Each structure stands twice: as structure tokens, then as C-alpha cells.
């Protein structure tokens, strides 16, 4: 298995409601800037505290599969010390509530 793989966010019920919930979570995140916020694709930039490095986080709605695919990557460097995974898992826990 890929060490960098992040499981999608699963949802049940209405896809539009799930998408709106995700949009609200990301929009309310500290140091997040929404770059693209469409009906099935969201791209946000998260700026790190301190040095201000930018991480790109993308979400894509897969309505048929009942999931939202996630991609999170640092723009600089190879190691992020788990910051991207921790951010996505924080979003996942808020999304699951």
C-alpha cells in the first residue's frame, strides 16, 4: 500500500448536502484560502504557521461511489512531518459528526 494514500471521505444520503458540509468545514479552517469552489471540485491552499509554506488540498465529489476523493500535498520539500495527513484526518473527523 502507498504510504501517502489518504482514504476518501465517505458519506451516506444526499451528495449535495455532504458537499455543502465539506465546503463549510474547509471555508472555516484557519489559514485556508479557497482557490476553486465548484459543485464537485474544491481546491484550497493551507498556509502553515510560522514559515508560511503552502499546502494544496483538493476534494472531488464522486456521487455514485458515495465518497469525496482527497488529495493533499506540500508544494515544497518531501517531508511534511505528517501535517497534511493530520489536516485531512481533522477534516474527516469534523465531516463525520
Regions from the PLM with identified roles:
Residues 1-97:
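Ser/Thr-rich, low-complexity intrinsically disordered terminal regions
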Amino acid at each position: 500500500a502507498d504510504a501517502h494514500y489518504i482514504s476518501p471521505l465517505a458519506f451516506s444520503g444526499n451528495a449535495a448536502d455532504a458537499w455543502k458540509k465539506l465546503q463549510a468545514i474547509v471555508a472555516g479552517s484557519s489559514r485556508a484560502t479557497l482557490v476553486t469552489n465548484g459543485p464537485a471540485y474544491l481546491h484550497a491552499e493551507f498556509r502553515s504557521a510560522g514559515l508560511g509554506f503552502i499546502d494544496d488540498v483538493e476534494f472531488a465529489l464522486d456521487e455514485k461511489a458515495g465518497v469525496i476523493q482527497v488529495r493533499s500535498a506540500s508544494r515544497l520539500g518531501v517531508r511534511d512531518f505528517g501535517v497534511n495527513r493530520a489536516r485531512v484526518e481533522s477534516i474527516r473527523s469534523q465531516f463525520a459528526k
